């Protein structure tokens, strides 16, 4: 895994962030914000899997059908980590699909707790006090 960020990577990250703003538009009681999360993965998958349509469908549907719910302000952190793992998997086949799913699932709870406590409780009280 390299630490350098290319211009193409910056474009993908920017597009993924913009798509992530639509995440709450696709709320479903069973999978919560999974479809919006899959849309945030789309810019990277479009570039890395453009020549492999079957793998593209499989990867996109995996993200669209797995439960996803976290604090909206912390969501780009989870998306960025999963996007980096998907890039490694698509380009080098060095990351397993189950690893990506388990990392995504294990980051949901802590980021929700941090985001809810900081942005919805502490920050609101501090700003209201000022």
Which sequence ranges carry the predicted segments?
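Soluble N-terminal domains of membrane-associated systems
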Residues: 1-96
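Transmembrane alpha-helical segments and their cytosolic interface motifs
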Residues: 98-130
């Amino acid at each position: 895994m390299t630490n350098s960020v290319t211009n193409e990577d910056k474009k993908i990250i920017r597009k993924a962030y913009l798509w992530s703003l639509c995440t709450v538009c696709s709320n479903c009681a069973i999978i919560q914000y999974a479809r919006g999360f899959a849309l945030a993965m789309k810019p990277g998958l479009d570039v890395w899997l453009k020549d492999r349509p079957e793998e593209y469908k499989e990867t996109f549907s995996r993200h669209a059908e797995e439960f996803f719910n976290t604090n909206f302000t912390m969501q780009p952190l989870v998306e960025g980590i999963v996007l980096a793992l998907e890039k490694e998997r698509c380009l080098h086949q060095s990351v397993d699909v189950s690893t990506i799913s388990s990392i995504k699932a294990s980051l949901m709870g802590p980021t929700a707790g941090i985001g809810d406590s900081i942005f919805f409780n502490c920050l609101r009280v501090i700003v209201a006090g000022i």
